[in-house]
């Protein structure tokens, strides 16, 4: 069937049929582009979640290290105290003998 026959059978003017055909092709392209964007967006969201989780883990690691820093300082203070007490006991032992 010729386009004019199709247009006449449907009661549509040939120019309307051409305009519909052009718009239909553009709409299909737009629909495909929107679907591609949605897929890209979904992939980006997944990747952002992965990055966020990695950053959280790294932050927890650094926070833990800072907490260990306090414990290290306390341990160093205890080592100094033990060293001073050891020297004091050695001196007392030397004085007693």
UniProtKB/Swiss-Prot annotation:
Q: Name one GO cellular component term.
A: endosome
| Keyword Nucleotide-binding assigned | no
Question: Is Coiled coil one of the keywords UniProt gives this record?
Answer: yes
Report keywords, A-Z: Coiled coil, Endosome, Transport
Localization, UniProt: Endosome
Coiled-coil spans in chain = 45-97
Q: Which family does it belong to?
A: Belongs to the SNAPIN family.
Question: How does it associate, per the subunit comment?
Answer: Component of the biogenesis of lysosome-related organelles complex-1 (BLOC-1).
**What does the function comment of this entry state?**
Component of the biogenesis of lysosome-related organelles complex-1 (BLOC-1), a complex involved in endosomal cargo sorting.
The protein in question is named Biogenesis of lysosome-related organelles complex 1 subunit SNN1
Per the UniProt record, the source organism is: Lachancea thermotolerans (strain ATCC 56472 / CBS 6340 / NRRL Y-8284)
